[in-house]
A protein has these predicted regions:
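Hydrophobic alpha-helical segments and their helix-loop boundaries in membrane
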Residues: 1-259
Length: 259
């Protein structure tokens, strides 16, 4: 049985172009996109996911594989997939940054471990928050929601060679500012508590100059930091849920869905 060349090209377009968007999202998304996950597993998951969702996707109208326009279409699919996965990565990095800010202010920053995702030495508090956020990401079915978002994006942003509006690119740029602002807000309550403790040490120094504040203050600050982290863990799920909704809102601005 022979297949026409045009039919083979159509089959390749229907599979390869969605594969580019889905695989780029999986390579970047939180949890699965980490460097600790082997690339073969990521690509295998991308191929299986693409194979399952291709039958329900709109037909690809752009099937000219051997042209310069095809290169632009592939770049477009890469950008869309990376942008969708980048939103989930920013959400997790928000908690990492909040943990690092808290570690620096409480004196716990000296406790560092090597982050296997990037090979750098980072505060243990930030990694602790990252582990909690990653577990909650899968508890909230974040991996399934990411696949749902990228599949929905094919209906709103079909593979036709048309690019995003300029506002969408600016939205992606502003996500970085949102991450730093949110991390500061998450660590604001512990930072306020540490500020009160440091002010009390200042009052003690003025009241009793002979008191060696360095031998007392540093151990007390460490213990207070651990107590503050323990006290704020009860609100961690609530904060994650709020950031989760914000992440969904960010992705919906790209794929045109309702949060």
């Amino acid at each position: 049985m022979e297949f026409p060349f045009s039919l083979i090209i159509q089959w390749l377009s229907d599979f390869l172009l969605p594969l580019v968007r889905i695989s780029s999202m999986i390579m970047v998304m939180a949890g699965i996109g980490a460097k600790t996950v082997p690339t073969r597993i990521k690509m295998g998951l991308a191929v299986v996911t693409t194979f399952l969702v291709v039958p329900v996707l709109p037909p690809v109208t752009f099937n000219n594989l051997f042209s310069f326009e095809m290169i632009l279409v592939v770049i477009q699919q890469l950008l869309i997939g990376v942008a969708i996965g980048f939103a989930s990565l920013l959400m997790l990095n928000t908690f990492v940054l909040a943990g690092q800010i808290l570690a620096m202010q409480t004196g716990l920053g000296f406790a560092s471990i090597v982050d296997p995702s990037n090979g750098m030495s980072v505060p243990a508090v930030g990694q602790f928050y990252l582990i909690l956020a990653t577990l909650l990401f899968f508890v909230f079915n974040g991996h399934l929601m990411m696949i749902q978002m990228v599949v929905h994006s094919f209906a709103v942003l079909p593979i036709d060679g048309n690019w995003w509006a300029v506002d969408h690119y600016w939205d992606i740029v502003t996500w970085g500012g949102w991450m730093f602002t949110t991390a500061l807000v998450l660590s604001l309550a512990p930072l306020t508590a540490m500020l009160v403790i440091n002010m009390s040490f200042g009052v003690m120094t003025r009241a009793a100059p002979q008191l060696n504040i360095f031998s007392i203050g540093f151990p007390f600050t460490l213990v207070a930091g651990l107590v503050i982290i323990w006290a704020t863990l009860g609100n961690f799920v609530t904060q994650f849920e709020f950031q989760w909704l914000k992440m969904v809102e960010l992705m919906c601005t790209l794929v045109g869905c309702s949060p």
